[in-house]
Amino acid sequence: MRVLVTGAAGFIGSHICEQLLAGGHDVVGVDSLDPSAHDGPPGDLDPGVRWEFRDVRDHDLWMGLLPEVDAVCHQAAKVGLGVDLSDAPEYVSNNDLGTATMLAAMHRSGFGGRLVLASSMVVYGEGAYSCARHGTVRPGPRDPADLGAGIFDPRCPLCGGLLDPGTVTEDAPVDPRNVYAATKLHQEHLASAWARETGGAATMLRYHNVYGPRMPRDTPYAGVMSIFASALARGSAPQVFEDGAQRRDFVHVHDVARANLIALEADPVHDGPLNIASGHPCTLLEAARTLAGAHADLTGEVIEPQVVGGYRLGDVRHITADPTAARATIGFTADVHPSDGLATFAGAELREPPKHRP
């Protein structure tokens, strides 16, 4: 199979390319080398990929390449919370316009192959919760007064009591809480519209907290594990917001890449979203301590994470996945347990941020 991978020079995309090549597939890698992420082509790009350094918003790019490929693995996106709302036009243009341009070209060219789309757990907003009195409930955004008082867990919208967190399934209501999350959900809706109108199928992989080699070093767009690892590399304590008890599911990039390969090869093809997670949630403080302990083993430098109590209004408290559907439909189960993956991540090579960030 010949697969077109977008965002192929990026953190996750580069690992997908490697696993596709190892699986015997041909790979066309498309990447715009956005200057907010790259100074130029990274030195670790696989030479077995046919590289096209162009923008996914370029309609002519798609019309030239789609007749040559059997599947599209769409990873290209501007990621993370960004700096502030002034980033919104860039997020919408890169993520939503880029996806719309791709889908329009797929329709016009009569593309009949597979589509696998990188989505994110951020589409859910807060995770699943239960109230002792009212059962399953969906809390709204947390009250700034509670956050300022150090009450970080969300309250029941019916009685105001504190809630117990659970795992979220793919049929949970969606509630994106920031611009990035809104664009990821819009990407899903656009892909679903394409699938309905053309009789195709779009597999949307909702990644949970991805970490691993080639993560970008500390930037406003980096994941939390990159931020922690960057702090340790500087000899600084990782700063853990709130009380550190917020729960996440950390999934290794090798597993995420493998999930894409499995989705591309699945028979029958799966149409719809799937959680891609380790299935072993932990608290943010536990993850930071695991990373700091592994750093100490490697370097002899003992640095304890600091719980700083601060908060960001766009953050959710707990979001952890139920991975059952991915196992049942495409046969994906994560291989890397976070306790092992985070320990090895302490010695992983991170990519340097661009020297001249726009």
Over which residues does each language-model region extend?
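A structural alpha-helix within SAM-dependent methyltransferase catalytic domains
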Residues: L21, L66, L103-H107, S192, ...
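C-terminal substrate-binding subdomain of Rossmann-fold SDR/epimerase-dehydratase oxidoreductases
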Residues: R54, L232-P358
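Hydrophobic alpha-helical packing elements
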Residues: I12, L61, T183, V224, ...
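N-terminal Rossmann-like NAD(P)+-binding domain of SDR-like oxidoreductases, especially those catalyzing
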Residues: M1-Y207
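A conserved pocket-lining segment of Rossmann-fold NAD(P)-dependent short-chain dehydrogenase/reductase
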Residues: D84, C156-N178, A202, R206-R217, ...
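Active-site proximal helix/loop that lines the substrate pocket
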Residues: A77-V83, S120-V123, N209-M215, A245, ...
